[in-house]
Amino acid sequence: EEFIKRWKELEVICEDIFDAPSGSPMDELFTRYMYYERAKQGIKLTTTEALRKFYEKDKYAILKREETLGNLEKLVQFWKSVLSQDDMIFSDRILRRLAVLNYAPNGMWTYLVSVYFMQYKDENNLLEEQAFYEFLNKITAFIWAYAFMRPGVNALRSPAYPEMIEIVNGRTVDFEEYRFDAAAVRNVVETYVFTNGRPITKSMLAWWAYNDESQQLMPLDVTLE
């Protein structure tokens, strides 16, 4: 009975905070958590199996673990705080970095951040501010550079999945194997044609806006054009 009550509460929060164009809001939470479990298993494969298939493995071993429901509850509360821009949980500069990432050209950042949270949360389910800030800066720089240099929906999988394994092993995220030449990136950005139809255009607008210290936090559902 207690399990059913907690499960229903999880469903309610997911429906409240996640937009799920395909699948259900709960699928979104389970997907974010899956990347943490994948990383712990050391899976680097760029092909991701279907959500149901992943959790069905070994007779639903992950779902049967005692800590799994608690982990899902912690993860959904974290994302609730992110999406409500909770300034009791996050500093202003963290909220600004998260606001920029909200306009990232793809959703890979949510998986990286979910893995980071699961690995580094303290007993109060909080993250050390300075380390989290540095992590957000790194993934923002890398994701933006990748969008210019290797555009494509699935291109980020190759560098992101190994980095998730680095995170769960307590190592610093540095994308060492996948770095670009700074001059080459600068050249591409300077000659790029920014049109409204390109996802990176909104990403750059958000990045530019929040680099201005006087820019107030905008609600995350604001459309940038």
Task: Give short role names for the model-derived ranges.
Residues 2-223:
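A cross-family structural signal marking well-folded subdomains
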